[in-house]
Each structure stands twice: as C-alpha cells, then as structure tokens.
C-alpha cells in the first residue's frame, strides 16, 4: 500500500510517501525558518501563506522522488490537528482535492500520533510502552497498552519545552530556532547559575516550565547581557 501523507500543522510544509507502513519512498520538507527568524518565533499568518505558496510544489516533488503517479497512491493521510488553524487548513484542503480528484480514501490524523508512531519506522513498539513526546508545541507523557490504546499521564501546565527554548533564545539575542543552539552552548558551559528546577515536588506527572523561563528572563533583565556567559546558563 502506498500512502501519501501531508503535514502542515505549524511552519513546515511536508509531504511523504510510504510503502506498507514502513518503507519511506520520499520525504519532502519546505522549511520556513528564515521567514520567521526575524520575529523570534512562528507568525501564524506568514506560516499559512507560505504553505499555500509551496504546498503543490512539495506534493509534486514527493511523488516524483517516490517515482509514483497519483493513480498509484492508495490512501491519503493528512494532519487534522492539533496545530495552527490556518496552516492546518492548507494541508487539509490539499488532501481533500487530491483524494477527490483521484478517488482515493482520505484519513485525518492527529499529529501527536504521528510523532508516537514515527518510532515504529525503525523499531516495533513493544507494549506496554511509555512515551515522552517533546515537540515545538507539546510536552506530554503517554502510556500505551496497545495500538491506539493511549492513556495520558501528564502534560505541560503552561509552556512546552520547545516554546521555552525559543522564548529564552529571544531574550538572549540568539537566533531562531533556539533549541539546537542552546543545546550546543550548554555542552560548553559550567553549572554557574542555579536556576529553579520546576514542578519536581508534586504527586502527579505533569510538567511546568514557566517558572524556569521567568527566572532566566528576570536574570537577564537584572544583569547586563554582555556580562553573562550564556553557556553557563
């Protein structure tokens, strides 16, 4: 079975073609990083416009790299949420048009399930399984007893880890996206600043990162940024 998958939940236009659920025939991604860098984060209106601009090109390239015609696609899958509404609509509309034009079945997918099941491309998931899902807009802990039998154990009560990285990077005058560079700098630093370690003494499995973000932002505001050795943070 050849599946065409379309993902536009945030700021990347992506189409992939997989065969029998395992073999990736193509995976084409148009990144908008440069378009959002000057703002230090994703601007929803810009994201949706860029999806409109590049959706058709990305889809055509995915089919080309997979060496398949539209008629050879057996199923169309598309992210239906969660995500930015304007961005999601572009992908959903493209999937609907493709499915209607070529008379293919259409499947809407929760993109968090996409994150979870991407692990299965290389390794089978052995149940029961514990999943820590960390992405740009989500930080969640799930317990899986079987396929699609998912119990939420915990989630962030405020900011997702990815959001915290980007907001902190902006306050430190670091480029967007902040995560990769902050990770690199952290490898070089010393444990000089003892920042708050959030939400450790609680009887649940939720997360909270707003306190850590606020502590660092306040530290930067109180001191001259030039006097702070960023890797030590």
UniProtKB/Swiss-Prot annotation:
| Cofactor binding annotation | Binds 1 Fe(2+) ion per subunit.
- Gene3D superfamilies from the UniProt entry: 3.30.420.40
Q: Please tell me whether the keyword Acyltransferase is annotated for this protein.
A: yes
- What Pfam families has UniProt attached to this entry? TsaD
Query: Which residues does the record give as Fe cation binding sites?
Result: 111, 115
Provide the binding site for substrate. Answer: 133-137, 166, 179, 183
The family annotation for this protein states: Belongs to the KAE1 / TsaD family.
Specify the protein name.
tRNA N6-adenosine threonylcarbamoyltransferase
Q: Which organism is it from?
A: Onion yellows phytoplasma (strain OY-M)
